[in-house]
Structure formats: structure tokens, C-alpha cells
Amino acid sequence: MGGFLSHLTPEQNVEALKASCGPVRGNIYKHDDVIVDGYLGIPYAKPPVGELRFKKPVTVDVWTEIKDCYKYGPACVQTGGFEQIAGPRTPTPEEAGCLTLNVFTPRNASSEFKNGRPVMVYIHGGGYELCASSDFCAYSLSGTLPLKDVVVVSINYRLGVFGFLTTGDNVCPGNFGLWDQTLALKWVQKHISSFGGDPNCVTVFGQSAGGASTDLLSLSPHSRDLFQRFIPISGTAHCDFAIRASENQAKIFREFAEFHGFSGRDSSALFKWYQEQSPETLSNVKGYKKSISGFLTFIPNLDGDFFPKPLDELRKEAPKKQMMTGVTEYEGLMLASMNPAFSPADVGLTLMPQGIYGKDVVSNPDEIQKIFYEKYVEGVDKSDELAMRKKLCEALGDEFFNVGVIQAAKNAAKHGNEVYFYTFEYVNPDSFGMWDGMMPFKAAVHCTELRYLLGEGVYSKFEPTEEDRKVMETTTTLFSNFAKYGNPNGKGATAEIWEKYSLNRPERHYRISYPKCEMRDVYHEGRIQFLEKIDGDSDKYQELVYGKKKSAKI
């Protein structure tokens, strides 16, 4: 909706940087006595069209002519039902030139990092179907993390059908969006030194589907050696929306093709049909309803290639990394407010488990759905709509985000990774813009932290108060400290305020807020244990994470 520095216009640099990818010219972003150079729309892969459509990305050739990198590249083709949140896409989405990335690098030499600054690579969210790196005002982004002595890279990757088509077999294993992200990380390894970054000190961070992508990248043998630290924000590989079994995802794509008129039988015919369709057809989901359970439609799958083993085995064998992960206080608040199907709240609390716990997930869906509903309405006056809406918000946040994030923290710690766990609980009550009147109460919601991390308001233009600026300073310091030192407390911290995550106290976490940040012992009022029990016994979760099935019986 608008960054806090979106009213400023950068100066275009006439001098070219002789980068190893090819010469580039970028923008000059001025912040008092600090200059940040920004290079927008740098191609990292050949256009994924023609014979390269629905294929793994191919590295772009080094160029010799100066490339003007003054503007973001086009967004990848958008799909899905979140347009009311994401708003109109700028620039216009397209297939041809969408695989680009952006680099923001402080101009002056670092006094601390002689071999190049630490690098932070951001992966945007949007349900694997929407959004782009261009959603973040470049001037605003340049005024956040890059002022903390790090180089920031943001990327585009293929979305929806174009990013995640699979036939469930060798004809089209899929996961092209994840292969795109991996190729972008390889670009960083090869070329970031030209931009003042250290390829041996890379942190990947992402939010929502970008957070799930970040965690998935830390597991795959194709990507996990390309970075040292990672920050999955409000999304991990363990979240409900992160990944599906290949046969279930293939069923969705067959159903979607049949919805648009496909009548073939085998995978080759299905793949050929997809190759022949226009972007307009493949991005049109209006009227389509999937038969497979889950919040999102076109998502990664456990393909046997990018993910050759179940997630727990991959986590166990992956090189040990430092992980920082967390959620906002009320992840589900905006989801509940924006979806008219969830009103009144009692209807929402009935429909929600029906969409999540189907026969493809648990063997006793009716029983699980009933238990889920009764757990969240326990002790609540059903005639009190405000109290019921709060429970709906809790249920949405717990199911889609809160349980998956703490499960990832536990799983990572179990396998020897150093973890820092947090909740983000600060909110400016005037930050919701047009959605203000739809909110039953105000709290930090899904995407709230992006205002303070990247300078961009998702629900309204970010016009920071003095208090907002203090929260931004705290947030960017914590995240950049982790990227630089592997410790959000900073270099050589002796009296650590933010403790490392411990399996002995699994709910203990760091609360980021204002005026005080502090460690807390209870995570979301202890509600998560109930959902962990369901997930621990569900066929879907057990198959994806552990490679085995176990029917849920509570």
C-alpha cells in the first residue's frame, strides 16, 4: 500500500558498475550521510517461455552492454484469490521477463566487514500465487536493513500454475518456483561480491509463503549449501499451506485442467495441454474448487527431486545452520476480517476445520472437525460475537501459522540447529487503512512486521510515528544482528537478552514489542499442544515430515 519513503525519487547513476554478471547502472538512495546503491530488475534466468515454460530455470548469459537497472522487473504471472489484499500489480505481470532480482548495497566500504558485507536475501510471500519484489518501495527498503551494514537482495520467482505445476511423476515433477529461488541463490554466490557482499555469509529470509520457502530451501540438497542462516517469518515447512504430497498436488492440477476443458488421460497429454494454454487461462481460478484439503491451491510438492526424502530426514542430514523464526500476535485476525464466509464467527469456526481436515488428511474427518470446533468454543458464550470472533482469529492463526512455526523450531533444534524463537506483538492501531472498520479489535496481524523490517505498509501506507521509528530500529537491529553474527543480540553479547531456543522449555520465546522486549514462557496461551496432537497423528503431516502414515484418533 505504500512505503515510508515512497514520496522520494532516487537519482539515477550514470556510472556503470562492472559486475561479474555484466555492467549495470542503478539508483542512488540518500539517507543523511549514507548512500545506498540500488540495482533493480537484474535478470538471473532466461525468460521461462517457449521450450523453457514449466522447466527448471536456465542461467542467463553474461552480458557486455551496460544494462540500466533503474526499475523493478515485471511481476510473475499472478494467480489466486487474494487480490483484495495484494491490490493491483505494478509493473504488469508477465511470463517473459519476470525472473529478476534486486540488490541494495551501502556505497561506502564497511569498517567491520573487510571481505564484503553479510547478505540478506528476501523471498516475498503471497500464498505462492501472488505478489512480487516490486511490492516493496525501493527507496523505503533502502532505508531499512541496508543501513545496518548488510547487502539486501530481493527476488521474483514463478507463482501459481507457472511455479508449481506437477503431474506427480517424471513428466513434470514441478516445484519450478523453488528451483527459481535456488538459481537466484546461486547467482548470489557467483556475483554478489561485485556488489560488495560476502557470498560466505548469506542469510535467507522470507515471510508467509516466503517463510515456508525459506525453510524448504534449508532442507533441499539442491539449495541448502547456498546460505548459512535463515529466518522463516510467519511460515515454515511444517505449516499447513507449505507443501503437499505429489499425488495430491497432481490431482489438483488435473482437476484444474478439467475445469478448463481438458479431457485427456495420461500425464503427457496433461503436460502438453498446460504448455499450450495462455497465461490468462492458467491464471483464471474463478469458479474452481479443489477437492484436496488445505488453505492454498498451487503449492510445492514432495516431488522426489527437489525433496528426495521426507522433511524430517532432510532436516537431520542437512548442514547445521542458525535459524530465527516467529509469528505475530494475531496471525489470523486479518484473515478472519477479510473473508465474508467466516461471518458470523460460529459459521467460520465450523467451516474452517471442514476445509482443513478432509479424508485426504485424516481417516476420521467428522470426529476431528467436531473436536476442533469444540476446543475453540469451549467456555465461550456463542451469542457473544466479539468473543467468538476472537476465538476464530486464534483458530486461524494457530492452524495456519503458529503451530507450524513452533514445530519447525522444535524440529530444527532436535537436529542440532541453533534456533531463536520470537513473537512480534507491536501494533500501531492506525495502520489498517480501509480495513480499520472491519477489525473486531487491533493487534499485530499477518504482515505487520514488514512495516518495521522493510519499510512497507501492506494494509495502508506506512507513515511512521516516532514510536514506529523506534520499533523499526529495534526490528532491523535484531534481524541484521542475526544475519551478521548469528545472534540477534549482537556481536560478542555477554548478557544475552534473547535466549537461544531450548527443547527443555519449548514455548519460551522472545516478545518483540514497545516499549519493552522480553522473554516469555507461554506461547499463545498453550493452545498449540492441541493442534500438535492432531498434526502428530494425521496422515498428511506424518507422510510429509516422516514418510509414514498414521490415522488421526484423538
From Swiss-Prot:
Family annotation (InterPro entries): AB_hydrolase_fold, CarbesteraseB, Carboxylesterase_B_AS, CM06B1-like
- Could you tell me the keywords of this UniProt record? Cell membrane, Cytoplasm, Disulfide bond, Hydrolase, Lipoprotein, Membrane, Myristate, Serine esterase
UniProt-listed CDD domains: Esterase_lipase
SUPFAM superfamilies per the UniProt record, alphabetical: alpha/beta-Hydrolases
The membrane-topology field of this record reads:
Lipid-anchor
> EC class of this enzyme?
hydrolase
Residues at the active site: 208 (acyl-ester intermediate), 331 (charge relay system), 446 (charge relay system)
- Pfam families xrefs: COesterase
Q: Which reaction does it catalyse?
A: a carboxylic ester + H2O = an alcohol + a carboxylate + H(+)
A single GO molecular function term of this UniProt record = carboxylesterase activity
Provide the disulphide bond pattern.
Answer: 76-98
State which Enzyme Commission number(s) the record gives: 3.1.1.1
Positions where lipid (N-myristoyl glycine) attaches = 2
PANTHER family the UniProt entry points to? CARBOXYLIC ESTER HYDROLASE-RELATED, ESTERASE CM06B1
Entry protein name: Esterase cest-33
Q: Which organism is it from?
A: Caenorhabditis elegans
Taxonomic classification: Eukaryota, Metazoa, Ecdysozoa, Nematoda, Chromadorea
